[in-house]
């Protein structure tokens, strides 16, 4: 477990500044991912969509090699397919709202959250 309250006191100015940035990664290459972490000390990442196995592996590499747990973004407003290409498409928010049934909104959020979380997305 990382003691996040004490962590900022043990960080260089470069590491503190790096925490402000989100990397829009274009590669899932392990050496590239490690290089981004070591050189830029990013606090978050957003990636290009891919199959669930690829995205999970990318997120595993990132979290295992980051000094502080990363925020990993996913656009899941229409379903798990925003986290990975083989995720479940539920429906965009306008379509869900048009049903006027809160159950569908709940299911959209539930499915999106389960699928994003399963591949390591947490933001």
What would you call each of these model-derived segments?
Residues 26, 34-123:
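Enzymes and membrane/adaptor proteins characterized by extended Gly/Ser/Thr/Asp/Glu-rich
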Residues 1-29:
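Boundary/entry segment of secreted carbohydrate-active catalytic domains
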């Amino acid at each position: 477990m990382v003691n996040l309250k004490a962590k900022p006191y043990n960080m260089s100015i470069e590491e503190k500044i790096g925490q402000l940035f989100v990397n829009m990664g274009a590669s899932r290459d392990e050496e590239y991912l490690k290089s981004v972490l070591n050189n830029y000390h990013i606090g978050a990442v957003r990636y290009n969509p891919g199959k669930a196995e690829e995205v999970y592996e990318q997120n595993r590499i990132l979290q295992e090699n980051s000094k502080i747990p990363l925020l990993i973004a996913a656009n899941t407003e229409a379903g798990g397919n925003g986290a990975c290409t083989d995720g479940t498409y539920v429906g965009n928010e306008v379509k869900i709202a048009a049903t006027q049934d809160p159950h569908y909104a709940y299911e959209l959020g539930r499915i999106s959250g389960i699928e994003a979380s399963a591949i390591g997305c947490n933001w």
